[in-house]
């Protein structure tokens, strides 16, 4: 399996923007990359304000929103609870089988979870159980400032305890006026976790375009390091899968 599992230290830390931006950059580089967010709460998949729509817009994939996210609920709750309150049952096998189906269309998939790794996800699994099924390297998206060292180091330790590989951390929402503290946090996360911080993505105020986000990702995220993971995972040695 090839791609990344994008998780976070919490909800609303910029996970969808990071996932969509990295996927969009990889597609510009010629990689046949798809995006997948199995479960979404807070918006139905077709809602332009939702994560599935944002993933589609930023990544540039041809996949429709309800194919990117096959299970979505309007109520903003943990996915398992939102599905239960709506009278729906989704099992781990269903979203894993769907992932395998998408791999027939794409060489690599960037999979976005929901919130953090311990979020109740399907009826029978947490987010981390799904990540373990896929065995993709993790990208951990985290806030850049106060509290992030603790949250990020704990997330990495939890992932490693479950046998998962953490490719790196991306601090999202970095403001210029806070960069001294952000860089200190970056150094502490790397020192305490042994995992590299691969990007300090700036804060986007108000509306933003796909072009702005992708250019920012190219400038502030170490895409070449992520490319190494994709190339090492794939059977196409040393070259993008077209």
Swiss-Prot record:
Protein's UniProt name = ATP-dependent dethiobiotin synthetase BioD
Name what cofactor the protein needs.
Mg(2+)
Known catalytic reactions = (7R,8S)-7,8-diammoniononanoate + CO2 + ATP = (4R,5S)-dethiobiotin + ADP + phosphate + 3 H(+)
- Cell compartments where the protein resides: Cytoplasm
Gene Ontology biological process terms from the UniProt entry: biotin biosynthetic process
Residues the record lists as binding substrate = 41
Q: What does this protein do?
A: Catalyzes a mechanistically unusual reaction, the ATP-dependent insertion of CO2 between the N7 and N8 nitrogen atoms of 7,8-diaminopelargonic acid (DAPA, also called 7,8-diammoniononanoate) to form a ureido ring.
Enzyme Commission number, as recorded: 6.3.3.3
Cellular component GO terms, alphabetically?
Answer: cytosol
Q: In which pathway does it act?
A: Cofactor biosynthesis; biotin biosynthesis; biotin from 7,8-diaminononanoate: step 1/2
Which family is annotated? Belongs to the dethiobiotin synthetase family.
Is ATP-binding one of the keywords? yes
């Amino acid at each position: 399996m090839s791609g990344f599992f994008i998780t976070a230290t919490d909800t609303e830390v910029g996970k969808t923007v990071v996932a969509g931006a990295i996927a969009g950059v990889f597609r510009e580089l010629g990689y046949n990359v798809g995006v997948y967010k199995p479960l979404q709460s807070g918006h139905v998949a077709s809602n332009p304000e939702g994560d599935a729509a944002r993933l589609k817009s930023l990544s540039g994939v041809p996949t429709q929103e309800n194919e990117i996210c096959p299970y979505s609920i309007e109520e903003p709750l943990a996915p398992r609870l939102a599905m239960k309150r709506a009278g729906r049952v989704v099992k781990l096998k269903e979203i894993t089988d769907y992932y395998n189906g998408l791999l027939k269309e794409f060489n690599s998939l960037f999979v976005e979870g929901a919130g953090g790794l311990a979020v109740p996800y399907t009826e029978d699994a947490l987010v981390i159980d799904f990540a373990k099924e896929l065995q993709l390297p993790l990208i951990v998206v985290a806030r850049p400032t106060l509290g992030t060292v603790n949250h990020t180091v704990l997330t990495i330790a939890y992932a490693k305890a479950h046998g998962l590989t953490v490719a790196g951390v991306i601090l999202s929402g970095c403001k210029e006026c806070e960069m001294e503290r952000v860089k200190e946090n970056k150094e502490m996360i790397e020192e305490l976790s042994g995992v590299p911080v691969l990007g300090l993505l700036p804060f986007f105020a108000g509306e933003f375009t796909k072009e702005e986000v992708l250019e920012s990702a190219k400038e502030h995220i170490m895409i070449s390091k992520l490319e190494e993971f994709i190339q090492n995972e794939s059977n196409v040695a040393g070259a993008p899968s077209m």
